């Protein structure tokens, strides 16, 4: 009986000593956890500048007294341009699960950016304007365009946006003097007035926020845009004389379209973001 009591006492003593020794051991340091990176918010206004390359095309035919007198002819041009832009964006989370009410979309809440902007492009986008039915040819230049519109996009990452845009646009084409297209050429005496065309545009692109620059708020934006002008055709007067005979009632009915790719460096003020 005494042996059993001594054995129990020894076990209790060993347990107490073991606990005391364990308490004296150094505790492992807590694992280091880096502070979370701040989440950028795209809400705010911005300015940007850059440039790109553009193409324009047109389908046109000559009229006399409003009646077509030549078949439709296709012409076009291409060239470089500079661009400036201002705009404002607003970022929010789109809870698709609650909006659509479908379990398939449960938990899917992408970050969405919507905004409005205006831009101006100027350059030398030169091309040809020929009227084969009248034996005339000339050089035509798109000198400037401007646009106002809206855009909507999804943040693939907190600093990478893909977007679509669209809106209203105007294009300015300079006037031109026609030459005879046959051998020997020479001035024809006819000219086409400068004209501003109204139209619409759609586009798509992406924008990326630089993370390695010391200045926060710098972005790189690339966009592809298609614009169409003239609706069912704009009638532009032909003026002058041929062989000393004044030309009256003649015009060129024209529809135009442009395509361009541009890249801009953007600075975002982020007044309302974080």
List where the protein language model places each region:
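Gram-negative outer-membrane beta-barrel domains
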Residues: 2-274
């Amino acid at each position: 009986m005494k042996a059993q009591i001594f054995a129990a006492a020894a076990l209790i003593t060993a347990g107490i000593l073991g606990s005391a020794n364990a308490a004296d051991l150094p505790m492992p340091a807590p694992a280091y956890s880096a502070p979370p990176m701040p989440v950028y918010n795209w809400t705010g206004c911005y300015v940007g500048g850059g440039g790109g390359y553009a193409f324009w095309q047109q389908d046109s035919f000559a009229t006399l007294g409003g009646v077509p007198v030549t078949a439709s002819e296709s012409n076009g041009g291409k060239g470089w341009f500079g661009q400036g832009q201002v705009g404002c964006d607003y970022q929010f989370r789109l809870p698709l699960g609650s909006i659509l009410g479908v379990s398939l979309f449960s938990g899917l809440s992408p970050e969405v950016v919507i905004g409005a902007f205006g831009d101006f492009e100027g350059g030398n986008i030169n091309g040809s304007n020929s009227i084969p039915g009248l034996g005339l040819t000339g050089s035509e230049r798109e000198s400037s365009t401007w646009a106002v519109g809206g855009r909507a996009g999804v943040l693939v990452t907190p600093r990478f946006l893909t977007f679509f845009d669209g809106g209203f646009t105007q294009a300015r084409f300079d006037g031109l003097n026609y030459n005879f297209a046959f051998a020997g050429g020479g001035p024809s005496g006819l000219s086409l007035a400068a004209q501003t065309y109204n139209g619409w545009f759609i586009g798509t692109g992406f924008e990326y926020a630089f993370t390695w620059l010391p200045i926060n708020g710098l972005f790189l934006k690339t966009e592809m845009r298609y614009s169409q002008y003239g609706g069912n055709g704009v009638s532009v007067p032909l003026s002058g004389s041929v062989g000393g005979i004044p030309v009256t009632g003649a015009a060129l009915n024209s529809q135009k379209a442009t395509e361009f790719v541009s890249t801009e460096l953007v600075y975002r003020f982020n007044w309302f973001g974080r």
